[in-house]
Amino acid sequence: MYAVVTRSCRWWSYALIAALLVPACTGNADGGSSSPDGPSSAAADAPRARSPLRDRPLPEPVPYRDAPEGITLADPAFEPLPGADAHFGRLGGAVYQIEIPHAWNGGLVMWMHGFGELGPEATVAPPDFRRYLVAHGYAWAASSYSSTSLIPQRGADETAALWDHFAREHGRPDWTYASGLSMGGWSSHIAAERYGDRYDGALALCGAAGTVPGLRVSAEYLVAGAYVAGVTQAELDASDDVGRLVEERILPALDDPGTRERFDRIMVDLTGGPRAFAVEGIHDEEDTNFARATLLAAARLAPPRDAPYRLGPDSPVTSEEFDREAVVLPTGDGYDEFSAGMEVTGDLAMPLITLHTTGDGQVPINQAQILRDRVEAAGRSDRLVQRVVEDPGHCGFSTAEQEAAFQALVDWVEHGDRPEGTNLAVDDLTDLDRTFEDHPRVTSESDGVVTLRGRARLDGEPLDARWMGAVVRHDGLVTPCNVTLPPSDNGRFELGVYADEASAGCGRRGSDVLLWTYAGDQRLFATAPVPWPAAGAASVEVEFSTSDPLGAAPAITEFSGEVYDDAGHRREAGGRVEAYVSTTLCGVASIRGSEIYVIGVAGPDSIPGCTAGGPVRFVVDGDEAGESGTNAPEQSTHLDLTVPAP
């Protein structure tokens, strides 16, 4: 009924670790292909030169696993974009997807997805900027990997094995670029060091700087929480259930405003220092990181402390005192085996551009600084350019920001035009260059967002859920309006909701907010609405019932996707999307900063004239879209929209 639409990486945030590495072996490949009718929607960029690697013999194939590791593999079949061919199949223990434009320019992007949450099934995730690649003549290829564990090294290796398959089947590309998001960004760092015989350059999006930095983030949430809650090393060592210690000692302590402020200030310093959206990002990822730290401690896989803690002048404690009193999480014999091959040394074999956000609470900005230091120590600074955008989210880049970074990499590799970057060798991160943002972000403290925080219960018990979201109801229209998708932990939650001035159709005076969550695979809505608060924040109590999944929500049809003009250019964030059944306005929304629209189409019970089963037409900033849908209440449809070019 209401689809969850967000940056793909946010789905990888809530589980952690564990299958240890197993020996690799060479496997077999099988696959298929498909192609739609019709010409390419945009002319491909003509290749201007060929990589020096192009005329070399193919390197020795990278070994890969014969079978998936404790998981099943999803069907990789997919529909290509107009003007492209789809190739898909299985390569040993993983499945893959390849998309090649009819007017291929000889360029290839090897895409690496993020952490699979230890899910039961491995799937392929295409790049967010897939349309841009195909429109500009680039092919792309992506692997599911043979595991859904935290395996950045295997992601890099199995993607390189897919490159071998591509080169055998389709010929060696003129240019190849490695890229990935979240754990895939970490994999991109590894690939940029390991596969200079295959790739010409790399674009790493929100990737960790290596094993210890990557795992230390979650551990430090627990360390800082224990410190402000007064949990001692002896208490931690005596506990046989770190999760209970978090639930009963640390989280209740953080409900106190003074303790919360001390925790926030320590965490800001541990993750890079004061900067835009630092606190918002820490709050967004708090439950995820406490859960990960609990698993690290239970599995004795916490990274070793490799340096003293360093806190800034704004922290409520000195570095020396915190270093002396901070608890140490256990590291067991399995750590070395688990982390083998994950490290990033900085010895780059190719140009690398990295992209980070200031508020990322999973891969904080200090990961970019650590990477920079390692690259400098390896004598490879001439091969690194880093960019930062101010955003509160993990991998919270717009697609346009990713596209711009990719084009900068191409210009650097193929034409020698080294791009500009963000200077991170500074003590003050509060005034970074904002050149690389394509739109300003709203904050939970702005007029465009309200914050709902409080307690949630499911069938009378405190709610534990991976996601909570919100829709806003106003004059019969219902619009998805959550800023992020935070979890609920033991009934505690904090959720940002857009106001109408930030996203069309969202909250204003007279609106109701309907919160939602999941219980297993069942979508549940709160049994009562929350009135739109008069101020920027409100404390609320909400109830969900498995016997009444719709709760107080009306039945709507939901559509989501991206908006392009007929020249292949993406419409910018902020555009207004309207949905009509005949001449009746039945839905309104904005194109979000991520270039995604999510719109609810009301049914006849909410607005007369919004006929169930009727055709739905879409208008974007006054322009009629070429696509249409059907008003089918309680259904969700992905639908990209195309409007006339200006």
Cite the ranges covered by each PLM segment.
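Histidine-bearing beta->alpha loop at or near hydrolase active sites
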Residues: 383-398
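C-terminal motif of bacterial Sec signal peptides marking the signal peptidase cleavage site
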Residues: 22-24
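Accessory cap/linker subdomain of secreted extracellular hydrolases
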Residues: 47-82, 208-343
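Primarily recognizes the serine-hydrolase "nucleophile elbow" in alpha/beta-hydrolase
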Residues: 175-228
